[in-house]
Regions:
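Short loop/turn segments immediately following beta-strands, especially the blade-tip
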Residues: 52-57, 95-105, 152-155, 193-199, ...
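Beta-rich, blade/repeat-based domains predominating
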Residues: 23-33, 67-78, 114-135, 163-179, ...
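Loop-centered beta-sheet repeat module
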Residues: 137-188
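Blade-loop segments of beta-propeller domains
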Residues: 20-80
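A short beta-strand motif characteristic of beta-propeller blades
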Residues: 17-22, 60-65, 109, 115-122, ...
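Asp-box/WD-like beta-propeller blade repeats and closely related beta-sheet repeat scaffolds
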Residues: 60-130
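Conserved beta-strand positions in repeat-built beta-propeller and related beta-rich domains
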Residues: 6-9, 40-44, 85-88, 140-143, ...
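Blade-level signature of beta-propeller repeat domains, shared across WD40, Kelch, NHL, RCC1
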Residues: 270-276, 286-303
């Protein structure tokens, strides 16, 4: 049975059907790949990372600095031995070793960065937005520098991928067919690349709506791409080759994140304070009418 957790800018972490566990602005959650352990990013000026044992509620088992300002994303390596954090405020990414019980151990590895982009307000400096492990390389999307930063698992810097100026890469997803897709928050695009050489294959507006669409999270499932647009409050669906299949209302205001569990897609609508369910059983997302009220939801995690 799937358990749904919701991170937020509100009172704490919601365990659906069980209640709220108080936590400091837990805007992003990640699960250990093999253990009943949950991690949360406390998006504060002095960022914190928290670990919890799951089952019968959440029990905090660890807490440490994120190594930077305003951590907004976490990723756990498939081996379960490393957790990566992206600190949006100062652009520092960090690596944290995990022991056999999934607890923090040793000193964190800090990965600061420098640079800027052409946007006068949003790209004055680096802004790490997401961490993704692909093979034995950590990829960090940097909205502030229009780069995908790359590091070894020991923290050695590799050559970054430089994307279109002003794109503002927010989230990305690798797919088994050797492609990677990136949501451009600042230029409103969804772009596809060859994952080996990062050759651009296609690009498309993430939304057909007029005005600024502020794309947020992007993910892939069953050969389709799903991307949220916070400006028009929509979810867009594309094929792997860039053909748009649908764009539909997200069910609320300012859709920030979504997750798929089986035939259900959950959307965290931050400003309206709801997590809304959509069924994928008919091929394209359709609202089920199921809604969970959460103060400022920012992340949905089915485990």
């Amino acid at each position: 049975m799937t358990q749904l957790y919701v991170g937020s800018y509100g009172d704490g972490i919601l365990t659906a059907g069980e209640g709220i566990t108080p936590a400091p602005s837990p805007s992003f959650l990640a699960a250990h790949p093999a253990l009943p352990v949950l991690y949360a990013a406390g998006e504060l000026g002095e960022g914190v990372l928290l670990s919890y044992a799951t089952g019968g509620g959440l029990s905090e088992t660890g807490r440490r600095t994120s190594g930077g300002d305003s951590p907004c994303h976490l990723a756990v390596h498939p081996s379960g031995t490393l957790l990566a954090a992206a600190n949006y405020g100062d652009g520092v990414a960090s690596l944290h070793h995990l022991d056999a019980d999934g607890r923090f151990t040793g000193e964190p590895i800090l990965l600061p960065h420098q640079g800027s982009g052409p946007h006068p307000d949003r790209q004055r400096g680096p802004h790490a937005h997401q961490c993704v492990f692909h093979g034995d390389v950590l990829h960090v999307s940097d909205l502030g520098t229009d780069e995908i930063r790359r590091y070894t698992l020991t923290g050695d810097a590799l050559e970054p991928v430089r994307l279109a100026p002003g794109m503002g890469p927010r989230h990305l997803v690798f797919t088994p067919d050797g492609r990677v897709y990136v949501a451009g928050e600042l230029d409103g695009t969804l772009r596809a690349y060859d994952a080996d050489g990062w050759r651009e294959l296609w690009q498309a507006p993430a939304s057909a709506a007029a005005g600024v669409n502020f794309p947020a999270h992007v993910d892939a499932a069953d050969g389709r791409l799903y991307i949220l647009n916070r400006g028009p409050n929509t979810l867009s669906v594309f094929t792997a080759d860039g053909d748009k299949l649908a764009e539909l209302p997200s069910g609320g205001d300012w859709p920030r994140h979504f997750a798929i569990a089986g035939d259900t897609l959950w959307i965290a609508n931050q400003n309206s304070g709801t997590v809304d369910a959509f069924t994928l059983a008919g091929g394209l997302p359709a609202p089920t009418g199921e809604t969970i009220a959460v103060k400022s939801p920012a992340c949905v995690l089915p485990v």
